[in-house]
Amino acid sequence: MLAACAGCYLLWWGVAFYPDRHAPLWLSGILLVATAVCGIMAVNWMVQGNFQTEGIRKGVSGGWILAGGVICYIVLLVISNLVFHRMVTTELFLIIGWAVLNLVTVNTLYASGLFSAGISVAFCVLTLAVVIGSLYCYMIYYNLEKWKGYIDGFLPLVMVGIAMLIMAGAMLYKK
């Protein structure tokens, strides 16, 4: 469902931010609502799954992952705003929020026995790579000319969508 959210977000971005052309407000609104609905459903399902899954081995406390995410967000907010003078937008919260949710989910899948330690580490590395790539795009966005900025806005969504499809495929394969 999070991959569907990324897909809806891609459509919205493509329509709403297409250079030199303004989409009808109703179309942009419908796509943004679809993105929000898919995102809320995905987060709800993932959180429910994380809480309802029985562990057969010990993982990292979800509280530690959440605390790390909060600290990471605050540090990145300060660095991006005060050091790089980049306007803080919702995307920073979404990047870090996705990473925290993804890491908690990988941890739950490890603790449940569905993912091995190796697969779990691979998904943690994939999550880190997507976050680094997304943060790079986030930081350079306002310094790009309009067409490059338009493409730059797509990249984090594509990376998240692919990562979520890979994780869904791994879960189905392991089941």
Where are these regions (language model features)?
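N-terminal topogenic module of multi-pass integral membrane proteins
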Residues: 1-59
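Transmembrane helix-loop junctions in multi-pass membrane proteins
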Residues: 46-53, 81-85, 105-112
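Hydrophobic alpha-helical transmembrane segments
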Residues: 4-12, 36-44, 65-76, 95-112
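C-terminal ends of transmembrane helices
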Residues: 11-20, 75-86, 138-144
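Alpha-helical transmembrane segments of polytopic membrane proteins
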Residues: 1-4, 25-37, 58-73, 93-97, ...
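Juxtamembrane boundary at the C-terminal end of a transmembrane helix
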Residues: 164-175
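Interfacial loop-to-transmembrane junctions
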Residues: 139-161
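Short alpha-helical packing/oligomerization segments
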Residues: 105-140
